[in-house]
Amino acid sequence: MDKSEMDKINGTNPESTDQAPSLASRPDEFEEEESLVTPDALSARIGGFQIYAGSVNWGVFGSMKIVFLKSKLNVLIPCGFLAIFLNYMTQRYGWVFPLSMLGIIPLAERLGFATDWQISCEVGRLLNSAFGNATELIISIHALSRGKLHVVQQCLLGSILSNLLLVLGSAFFSGGLACGKTMQTFSKADAVVNSGLLLMAVMGLLIPAALHYTHSEAQFGKSELALSRFSSCIMLVAYASYLYFQLSNNRRRNEANVYPCMPLIKRRIQDDVDGNDDEVPEISKREAISWIAIFIAWISMLSYYLVDAIDGASKAWNIPVAFISVVLLPVVGNSAGHANAVMFAVKDKLDISLGVAIGSSIQISMFGIPFCVVMGWMMGKPMDLNFHLFETASLLTTVLVVAFLLQDGTSNCVKGLMLFLCYLIVAASFYVHADPNSKASEKPPQN
């Protein structure tokens, strides 16, 4: 019996003898390649092809369960209903105001959750840009419609100060403690661009204030308002250009990384293969849009009672309206962002923390404030960029401190503590600040 016949009896193929050792010599690679192409292996690796459909609760009750039961902050939702009840039954604004604040906090967090789904990277970033500070804008628009122009200015100013000092300081301090590093690093180039945008916003607010306090207006009472409206349009164009630049930059990076902006199911499979632990959206696109509309309407309703109770709460608590507007109101919109910034800093993802804190400040200063000026223009309200001397000085010093601390691209506990202490100084200054413009800001409409 010759050798070929013996090979047939033993079940071996003489032609495959050259390939067999190569496969046997690297069994791990062979198994890995097989797992990438075999449906059963791929199914076992990501939990089956039904992971996407199973992770998205398409039913109404499943969506409600996710939205209302997955956040511990939702225990505060009944506070909103209690605030409405007290407003109509007792009109005790000292209680209506804090209950309205507590009722809005979980709604703001859930609004952020509803905008978290992403069909593509660009859509996700645009949604976050549009709704990242929706709560502050809704409160500001309600105050604007009531003619409380200085409350609008101070609320938006307080949001910027809170993000730059309190949120960023907490992120730096917590990240330095948790990571056990002498220094944490972040993108110096992004920090420089962000600092430049913040300084541009300060310039937009500083010049109208200087025009007012130097009494150098060509037409008293009109030049300041006209300059504010013109500058607001310029700032909106600058912010739109910044968004376009950011999205274009990210698109180029995504193309270089091959797959980060692929459709969700493909990205989920690839990320699972690469070991990334990205979460699949828990609600569908249609459900997310519906919840966004519901939460905006709900926040808008509670904001009506919140704004209406500011003066009453100021008298009941014997604290200045400026302190309520600058320190307390920003807590409503910044609470969820504050927690996220600290969480990412603890995980040593400081660039994301800066995106939350400084990105929110840029959006308020370059979009929120100019948007309110334009909205006031449309409503016939003389909303301008003259935030008055004390408020503008507070913003200028804050931006300068933050810009200096960011210029080297590193952070530590000491920097975080410095920012936090600076916020305490600012908060105390508004507590003792007797606002001479609170009544002057209720100006008659001008055309």
UniProtKB/Swiss-Prot annotation:
What species does this protein belong to?
Answer: Oryza sativa subsp. japonica (Rice)
InterPro entries the record matches: CaH_exchang, CAX-like, NaCa_Exmemb, NCX_ion-bd_dom_sf
- Gene Ontology molecular function terms on file: calcium:proton antiporter activity
| Start-end of Polar residues biased regions | 10-22
Tell me, what is an example of a GO biological process annotation in this record? calcium ion transmembrane transport
Q: Chief localization class?
A: membrane
* Stretches the record annotates as Cation selection: 132-167, 333-368
Protein name per its UniProtKB record? Putative vacuolar cation/proton exchanger 4
GO CC annotations? plant-type vacuole membrane
Compartments it resides in: Vacuole membrane
Q: Quick one: where's region Disordered?
A: 1-29
Similarity-based family: Belongs to the Ca(2+):cation antiporter (CaCA) (TC 2.A.19) family. Cation/proton exchanger (CAX) subfamily.
Side Cytoplasmic, residues: 1-65, 115-122, 181-190, 246-286, 340-353, 406-413
